[in-house]
Amino acid sequence: AYRMMARAGGADVAYSEMVSCAGLHYGGNGSWELTECAEGEPDLAVQLFGTKPELFREAAEGVARRLGTRLVLIDINMACPVPKVTKKGEGAALMETPELAETLVSACVEALAPYGVPVTVKIRRGRYDGRELAPEFARRMEAAGAQAVAVHGRYATQFYHGEAEWDTVRRVAGAVKIPVIGSGDVRDAHEAARMLSETGARAVMVARGSYGNPWVFQQAKDILAGKEPFAPGLVTRIEAFECHMRLLAAIGAHLKRGRSLANWYLKGMPEAAFWRGEANKCTTLEEFLRVSARIKEAMAEAEDHGFETR
């Protein structure tokens, strides 16, 4: 549902959640489900993690066969900072074992060659504070066959605390010939445009900056084209929330997620705290839609009194 909202908002590519190569190998239905396109979803970039080359080769081939032309790329996650991942040598821990990382990339590149699917890598500044590995590591991934590298400007030990160091993105962009994707602290469309202009990145990866604002992608494109960025009105934002909730219901997701979605879509609206409280009582699609209908009624009354809501 999140991916479909992002694509509708102008995103060129949407990624799956991280999928374990071992999970795919041992037949976990839950793992394979993560690699599937939802109904109405045009295509997908699938994000894999693990440490075994043979499992990466098997996973990449399996995903390519299942998705066919809907597979945009395979991304190898070497950026995840979560301890349960890094303690197994996976995710950001791979930045400390570049030879293994090269082998994983090569395995995927070889497996996907018959399908014409590119392999990309996502990395961080490094694993440990003060030990920047990204530029040299990116060069090695390029030599192994990666066709793009996404760079998050924090160390793994920082998780998502502190500020992302965009100069790291710039240094990586200067170190490789393949496209670099900038990531980290891209909170709105203006920051996305600034990331491109200041770092030499060829693309921007946006996550938290799109929460409650799936239009951020088109807004960034507007800014780069010298246009006034699209500014959704309050009613448009509520209608987007309704659409997001219907998508969640359609894929059978737990609808309590709607409570956190409401927090994001309602941010900055009049009486937002009250309406968040109402949304936090909801458990079904019908209940969420009733709350959103009440919000729109309140907005219509406000408009009658001269307040702009569109």
Where are these regions (language model features)?
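Alpha/beta catalytic cores of nucleotide-metabolism and tRNA/nucleoside-modifying enzymes
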Residues: 1, 8, 118, 130-148, ...
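Glycine-rich, positively charged N-terminal anion/phosphate-binding segment
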Residues: 1-69
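Alpha/beta enzyme core
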Residues: 8, 57-90, 97-178
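Hydrophobic faces of well-ordered beta-strands that scaffold small-molecule active sites
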Residues: 14-16, 44-48, 74-76, 119-123, ...
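Active-site beta-loop-alpha junctions enriched in small/polar residues
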Residues: 19-21, 49-51, 79-81, 122-128, ...
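Short, charged, surface-exposed secondary-structure boundary motifs
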Residues: 25-27, 159, 213-219
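Pocket-edge positions in alpha/beta enzyme catalytic cores
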Residues: 48, 92-96, 161, 229, ...
